[in-house]
């Protein structure tokens, strides 16, 4: 398992489109290379321009993706709630990221 702590994603923004066609901007907080263990990569996103709430928390969304054959990033997929091993790995990497920052 590897992850890209050295990549500064603070200014990378992507647009997600929901089922109703609404577009929302998100900033990439962290990418995680989980190909060795799970065969896919992960990305942690925060709504663009979001601020911490009164309790110091901020909404973070996690998705998985696989690279296309041409090397481009594929579509984002929700991570199944019952995939404990994946969530444990994401939490471990995220906590390490927080400790480093």
From Swiss-Prot:
It holds the Pfam family DUF1292. InterPro entries: UPF0473 (IPR009711). Belongs to the UPF0473 family. This is UPF0473 protein SPy_2112/M5005_Spy1795.
């Amino acid at each position: 398992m590897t992850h890209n702590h050295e990549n500064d994603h603070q200014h990378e923004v992507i647009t997600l489109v929901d089922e109703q066609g609404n577009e929302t901007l998100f900033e990439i907080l962290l990418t995680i290379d989980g190909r060795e263990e799970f065969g896919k990569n992960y990305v942690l996103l925060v709504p663009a321009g979001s601020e911490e709430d009164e309790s110091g928390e901020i909404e973070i969304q996690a998705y998985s993706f696989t690279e296309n054959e041409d090397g481009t990033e594929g579509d984002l997929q929700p991570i199944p709630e019952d995939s404990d091993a994946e969530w444990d790995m994401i939490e471990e990497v995220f906590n390490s990221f927080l400790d480093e920052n």
